[in-house]
Amino acid sequence: MFKSGFVAILGRPNVGKSTFLNHVMGQKIAIMSDKAQTTRNKIMGIYTTETEQIVFIDTPGIHKPKTALGDFMVESAYSTLREVETVLFMVPADEKRGKGDDMIIERLKAARIPVILVINKIDKVHPDQLLEQIDDFRSQMDFKEIVPISALQGNNVETLVQLLKDNLEEGFQYFPEDQITDHPERFLVSEMVREKVLHLTQQEVPHSVAVVVDSMKRDEVTDKVHIRVTIMVERDSQKGIIIGKQGAMLKKIGKLARRDIELMLGDKVYLETWVKVKKNWRDKKLDLADFGYNKKEY
């Protein structure tokens, strides 16, 4: 008997949702950084064994939006509640329950689907503090299970996955066993470039960046995959930061991104990077759609 199911990973920004998904999948599906709101789109991670398939949906961190992009991200996250049988509500062990958590809990109660509370980053707290966190959240909602983990170190992750397997119902194998995500290679390439921008820049720059893959094709002469990407920013000053002195920052972004893209594609890559200014794109719906933040997602 084959069993399958869809599982959403929900929570505030920076609680470790993407780290968890990447650990379960055994490779990078979702980009990671220490910046809030790193994940902007829903990312599917397809975990398949001989007898089960769990389709994880990693979601943007739920926050109080200040732009049209923020609205898109939050609605995209909540839309998964219509698509899944189980929700993993992830919270950090080293932060007390806040208004953001309470807001999510109210939406989860209204959704009327099983919710597993996942308390991440247990490696950062004393066991007594963890017990306080468990008691506090337990008083707010009737969770199906409460599972403390460390997604970074892998502590208890297998236990959580086994719990999900045990609760799967008989179902179809929705995706081939060798497919690990629903996103095309172009999307993954753009995300890998954006990840390097997030790692290398500060303040408002990371949040103001979108990456568009203009072209991606094999060069018959060099036998490399030739990729041209454009990094979009909102202001000229941000463009200057991305390019850097004598182009040094842009070269660094390109070098680090190319390495990851080559690992993903298993191929040699020539990566061409450009930077353009598109003023206030985060509040323009047409620009959002052009850059891959489309309402079709929800």
Curated annotation (Swiss-Prot):
Keywords: Cell membrane, Cytoplasm, GTP-binding, Membrane, Nucleotide-binding, Ribosome biogenesis, RNA-binding, rRNA-binding
CDD domains tied to this protein: Era, KH-II_Era
Stretches assigned to coiled coil: none
GO BP term, example: ribosomal small subunit assembly
Annotated GTP binding sites: 11-18, 58-62, 120-123
Sequence segments annotated as region (G1): 11-18
Subcellular location: Cytoplasm; Cell membrane
HAMAP family: GTPase_Era (MF_00367)
Protein name: GTPase Era
Organism of provenance: Streptococcus equi subsp. zooepidemicus (strain MGCS10565)
Phylogenetic placement of the source organism: Bacteria, Bacillati, Bacillota, Bacilli, Lactobacillales
